[in-house]
Amino acid sequence: MKVFSSLSRPPLLLHLLSVFIGVAASKDGFCSAPSSVFDGEANSGALYWKVTNPTLSPSHLKDLPGFTRSVYKRDHALITPESHVLSPLPEWMDTLGAYLITPAMGSHFVMYIAKMQDNSRSGLPPSDVERFAFVVDGAVTLTTGSGDKHNLMVDSFAYLPPNYHHSIDSDGSATLVVFERRYAYLEDHAPELVVGSTEKRPLLETPGEIFQLRKLLPTSVAYDFNIHIMDFQPGEFLNVKEVHYNQHGLLLLEGQGIYRLGDSWYPVQAGDAIWMAPFVPQWYAALGKSRTRYLLYKDVNRNPL
């Protein structure tokens, strides 16, 4: 079983092991940073804190020149925090971003991280493009074209239909994960603005599975994608080894585990992003001492032709 081909050279493997040994074991059972970092985590009390402060952070890999956990293949990609390249987001004001998934790799959607600060403001997506924004850190204000305002805290989200005038503003540090897609129109069906939070969405039945599932968007045919929130307790795993036509974009919000993509098996942790092409075999198992939660994009309600 091949996990990381880049670890095949003994000197690099030994050096990486020394990095792991040199840091403290965290409360969730994964090698992590010195105790000062844990003190910060304990004091933060913030949901999804490890998305922006991952256990195995870029600073832990600074003594490994050229090393990254990121992988790009024909039918999947694992994009890890140490390989993010931040730059000003087009059309956004005072906002840095990192595009994690784009059509350049074969997807029909984009997924990016937006890092906002004081006086940051979103731009509008291109014509006929819909947007979904989820807050993983901080707080933002969504203002609609009619002037209605919605305060979005961590774990809150907004779906903006295509050509829907709006702005997302921040008065302080905030991090969003954003999905955008050119909308696939259906006659006599039109999606509407959706604003909500994860915990207010009902748990759904998952026949044959043991994970918990919430869908953040309506399941009606007006919506051509949905966003799933999936929770696994340590030791739980997908029963179905999925192979399907749908594409996925995934952000691990909490926890750690092993993700199978094709014939590769990847250790993953909060902050990691994954792209899954149509028909790539996929499977997940949660490890550690705390739950796994991930956010998952999935195209739905459209004939693949």
Indicate residue ranges for each PLM-predicted region.
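Long compositionally biased, domain-poor regions of proteins
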Residues: A139-G145, H150, I168-D169, Q233-G235, ...
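Extended, compositionally biased flexible segments
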Residues: R121-Y159
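A short, N-terminal "cap"/entry segment at the start of jelly-roll beta-barrel domains
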Residues: K27-H108, S173-F225
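Ligand-binding loop in jelly-roll beta-barrel domains
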Residues: K149, S156, P162-L186, P278-P304
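Cleavable N-terminal signal peptides of Sec/SRP-targeted secreted and luminal proteins
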Residues: S8-A25
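Short, conserved beta-strand element in jelly-roll/cupin
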Residues: K115-M116, P126-L142, I229-F232, E242-I258
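Short acidic-glycine-tyrosine-enriched beta hairpin
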Residues: S146-P162, G262-P278
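Conserved short histidine dyad/triad with adjacent acidic residue
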Residues: D94-L100, V110-S127, H228-H244, P278
